[in-house]
């Protein structure tokens, strides 16, 4: 049985963590990007399907290309952030299941079932996106998850010729506290929960 994390860890992951609109002028390294993946890949997905595909926009050219396909306010955030990740979902994730889930023929569950493929890819890449945020926070980085972009245009610009579609985008770096406002309310347990 695992021991509960201490308050400092919970604060870093949740209670004191924020979604940032701006970042300090401090670079994020390739090693840190790899560390994020090497942590987040252990988060559970259905049949270990791991449908998320990430493009890390690190260069000025890549960030400008992405920013042009977003709402203006989001584009500004992308241009200012050290890195922005495009969290995509591979609609052919099931082709990897013989390797990733070898103890049964999980691939056959999905072949020809487009509705199940799309639901599974979206749900599990969204889960992986959440693991991405928590992994980044655990490694001392900050994030800013966003929609507010032209999905079809992003897919054409970054995933052309593949079966990958964009889910959401997320800036990454060392957050500038001057870029955020006071935290919005988080209601108590009884407001949104029922125990039956």
Model segments located where?
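A glycine-rich helix N-cap at a beta->alpha junction
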Residues: 75-78, 83-87, 160-181
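Small-aliphatic-rich amphipathic alpha-helix that forms the alpha element of a beta-alpha
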Residues: 40-42, 85, 105-157
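C-terminal helix-cap and adjacent tail motif
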Residues: 2, 10-13, 19-20, 93, ...
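N-terminal amphipathic, basic helical "cap/leader" segment at the start of enzyme domains
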Residues: 1-94, 194-196
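Short Gly/aromatic-enriched secondary-structure transition segments
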Residues: 53, 99-103
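Acidic, glycine-rich active-site loops and adjacent beta-strand->loop/helix elements
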Residues: 91, 149-152, 176
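Short Asp/Glu-rich motifs
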Residues: 32, 59, 155-156, 163
